Amino acid sequence: MKKCAMKKYLIVNGDDFGATRGINRGINQAHRCGILTSTSLLVNTPWSQEAAELSHTSPELSVGLHVHLENGVRKLNSGPSQVRTALDEQLLRFQMFVGQLPTHLDSHHNVHRDPELLPLFLELAQRYGLPLRDHSEVHHFSKFYGQWSEERHLEQISTGSLTRMLETEIEHGITELACHPGYVDPQDTSSYSVEREAELWALCEPRIRHVLAAQSIQLISYHDVPRLLAGAAV
């Protein structure tokens, strides 16, 4: 990435789009009022269609597929064909909701990192030319997260913490900063709840844009990645 490496490009990607109505609202607000440029859509929840409809109102937002595999499928009890079928079905549902292919591919709880599952995810990514998290020219950055060792660490997702990360840990080239903004609501049964609102406030803090400018970090989405990589190859 010769030309690409001359600059710092940052994708801010919100996982779990479609998980709940509160998460949908949070991701939408983080895009409209904050620095979020991309999201990853769950397609097998009651709020998936609502999320897709929200994305249609924000054409600059890149939308990827956030694959969610049930435990039974994840164990490969019926062999790779069961997982392959689940991946194909979720891609088809994504196209039905969004009207186009995803801009990128990742997975809930990063199950694609499982050595048994990874080849099947790579197969899908290669078939459709999709960047797969950890397996593309986009560097994945996961430190903006409010739980470690099953303990809550809101200080890790504060405006100050995000500022320090942007100032010291964003590399030249293309980086995806993963985040999980949202509003707490009764539909969210996960342990990651109030952390979502803390992330949302940090992402929407106006001072963060000044930090990006001071560090010469350019916000992009996955829509921009093919163009940047093509330019870097020249």
Residue ranges and their predicted role:
Residues I27-C33, S48-G64, L92-V98, T168-I170:
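Acidic (Asp/Glu)-rich catalytic clusters
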Residues M6-R21:
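Boundary/entry segment of secreted carbohydrate-active catalytic domains
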Residues D15-F17, L42-N44, H66-G72, H108-N110, ...:
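Active-site beta-loop-alpha junctions enriched in small/polar residues
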Residues S190-V234:
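C-terminal domain-boundary segment and adjacent tail
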Residues G72-R93:
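Glycine/small-residue-rich loop that forms an oxyanion/phosphate-binding "nest" at active or ligand-binding sites
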Residues F17-R21, L41-E50, N71-L76, H108-E116, ...:
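Acidic-and-aromatic substrate-binding clefts and catalytic sites of carbohydrate-active enzymes
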Residues Y9-I11, L36-S40, E60-H66, P102-H104, ...:
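Structural preference for beta-strand elements that scaffold enzyme active sites
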Residues L91-I170:
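Catalytic domains of cell-wall/extracellular-matrix polysaccharide-remodeling enzymes
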